């Protein structure tokens, strides 16, 4: 049963991550929030029509509700009176709140719990089983497996169109593609994924899996195909590690998965080879050291033939004349010596030919 839970978690994670990459790149990540919270209204309305949650009608209603939330948010944005993030924030609470009211008033005896919709319970997902080609499989695994296969098929067929419309809608239009149609197709795929996943992992975890792994993958690569692969791997790692963490601490599985997704993002944010905080700090430190070496070369070149050379070019006086701390001055001198920019002559620091060239090239100092 644990293996089935792991499989469900991986399938859901990969499906959410694939959709999330395009949401992150299009800067509409919160649209997943709007869709995942709006589905409860569609489920309730679908139940009113079919009088059962086991039919296909609530699923279709949830997908339609997700698309309606996207359309309403875009219509609000096009008025020019509210921005895109505010439009999303206006639409989904209203639809979610209306769904909760309808559940409490007219569907109180229905097995539809708002806590389960938000948080899910993936640990119990294998208990709901269906027969699939003579195999007894968890319904969630079959459902999300079908969604994932559909997403992979759509990516294979329309990868070029999605890529061009995401990065350059004007070029897509000139090539005969419809960015609007592609956008609504993407939103339909996101809606189906959210509806399929919320029953297993809940709306909150769907949001975390759609935003966090793709955002981390974006810090690791600029290649779209590689980004899709990395986002899927990161989402799978977050789900698996979160699942075992929840078992270890006997806590919420959805909460542990979301936490591990955040931990993985934090690690990538800190240690990404290209965009990580540590990398940027090291680059800034190196640039600052390069600038200090140039400053030292200019200072020594300026006073090379002056009567104050014995003072201005003395290493012990750098803290006074260049306003450096003793530690910083020592580090700059070590670097300049290692690079062959200066030489020690007793207590003095004198420029080498390479140091003179550096001063002339960078600041046009006449020496």
Curated annotation (Swiss-Prot):
Membrane topology designation: Multi-pass membrane protein
Keywords assigned by UniProt, alphabetized: Cell membrane, Ion transport, Membrane, Transmembrane, Transmembrane helix, Transport, Zinc, Zinc transport
One Pfam family of this chain: ABC-3
Assigned GO CC terms: ATP-binding cassette (ABC) transporter complex
A Gene Ontology BP annotation from the UniProt entry: transmembrane transport
Transmembrane spans: 5-25, 28-48, 56-76, 87-107, 140-160, 170-190, 201-221, 224-244, 251-271
Family as reported in the entry's similarity comment: Belongs to the ABC-3 integral membrane protein family.
Summary of the function given for this chain in its UniProt record: Part of an ATP-driven transport system TroABCD for zinc.
This protein's name: Zinc transport system membrane protein TroD
Organism: Treponema pallidum (strain Nichols)
């Amino acid at each position: 049963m644990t293996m089935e839970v792991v499989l469900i978690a991986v399938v859901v994670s990969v499906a959410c991550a694939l959709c999330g990459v395009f949401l992150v790149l299009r800067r509409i990540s919160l649209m997943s929030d709007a869709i995942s919270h709006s589905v409860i209204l569609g489920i309730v309305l679908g139940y009113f029509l079919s009088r059962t949650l086991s039919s296909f009608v609530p699923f279709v209603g949830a997908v339609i509700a997700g698309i309606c939330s996207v359309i309403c948010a875009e219509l609000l944005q096009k008025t020019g009176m509210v921005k895109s993030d505010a439009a999303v924030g206006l639409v989904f609470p209203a639809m979610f709140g209306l769904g909760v009211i309808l559940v409490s008033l007219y569907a109180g005896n229905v097995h539809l719990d708002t806590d389960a919709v938000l948080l899910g319970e993936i640990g119990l997902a294998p208990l709901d089983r269906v027969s699939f080609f003579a195999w007894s499989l968890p319904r969630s695994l079959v459902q999300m497996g079908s969604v994932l296969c559909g997403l992979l098929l759509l990516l294979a067929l329309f990868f070029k169109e999605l890529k061009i419309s995401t990065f350059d809608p004007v070029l897509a239009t000139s090539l005969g593609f419809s960015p609007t149609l592609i956008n609504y197709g993407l939103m339909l795929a996101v809606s189906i994924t959210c509806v399929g996943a919320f029953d297993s992992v809940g709306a909150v975890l769907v949001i975390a899996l759609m935003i966090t792994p793709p955002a981390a993958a974006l810090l690791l690569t600029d290649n779209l195909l590689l980004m899709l692969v990395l986002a899927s791997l990161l989402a799978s790692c977050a789900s698996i590690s979160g699942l075992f963490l929840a078992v270890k601490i006997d806590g919420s599985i959805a909460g542990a998965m979301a936490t591990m997704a955040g931990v993985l993002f934090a690690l990538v944010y800190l240690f990404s080879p290209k965009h990580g905080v540590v990398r940027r700090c090291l680059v800034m430190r190196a640039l600052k050291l390069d600038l200090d070496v140039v400053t030292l070369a200019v200072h020594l070149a300026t006073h090379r033939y002056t009567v104050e050379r014995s003072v201005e070019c003395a290493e012990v006086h750098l803290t006074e004349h260049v306003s450096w701390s003793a530690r910083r001055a020592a580090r700059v001198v070590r670097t300049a010596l290692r690079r062959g920019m200066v030489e020690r002559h007793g207590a003095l620091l004198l420029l080498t030919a390479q140091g003179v060239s550096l001063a002339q090239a960078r600041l046009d100092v006449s020496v």
